[in-house]
Amino acid sequence: MTIPTYSTLHIEYDQGVATVSINNPPVNVLDVALMSDIRAFLTQVRDDPQTRVIVFQSADPEFFIAHVDMTLIDEPNAFDQFAKDLPNGLNPFQALGEMIQAQPQVTIVKLEGLARGGGAEFVAAVDMAFAAIGRAGLAQCEALMGIIPGGGGTQYLSQRMTWGRALEVILGAELIDALLAERYGWVNRALPANELDAFVHRIATNIAALPEGVTAAAKKVISPADLSEGFLREHKAWAGLFARPAAEKLIRGGLQAGAQTKVGEQDLEQLLRDLSAS
């Protein structure tokens, strides 16, 4: 199979496993370029029988996918180019998660750094996720921007963890470390950082080596529930909050205070809380 060139992704194939390294500096925000590349790659390999497992990782050890590009506040129609391909009722961010879930290959995230907002939703959408103890962190910090998760997070989290824990994650808006993420069900396992690569390589290659049809059968019978009504509720609530002046003020203030920079993203939750308190 010919491997296209992507501006934000580097792809390597080995033993039926496609390893996708995300590289969208400075902090891997989920912007139009990154979403375009991920969608194009998933479409490219969807019907490729030689690709049996997809492992997503980051070229930056500090950040997996920081979150959705906050400059969306200035370009609210930036993602409209994806509208023609969207299933009824889904926004582009929800549609990306559903595209991942519908992928015939097993999808795995190897999480070494931070994933917030849309990045954390990406982690919740894949089939499996494994996180490095002491390095990985997850957060749905949207509440600190005056909104709620709008890319499927409310629905995926309520499947992966209890109702109360999902509310805690969304409304508490705190950075969750790898061990607590494992306990809550956000990731499959938390592993020592020096063991993560070998473990993910082993499980990915073992799955890729299974007899033909086994993976497809397992994914079919262990399929997630129909979340279409939940997505509609989520989008309506998210869009309503996003349009309010309070959200615009917090998002713009966050950008001015250093969000989407390496320094500002280290403790984004506190940066946003300080804005709310001012």
Which residue stretches match the model-derived regions?
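Charged catalytic carboxylate motif
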Residues: 33-37, 92, 99, 199, ...
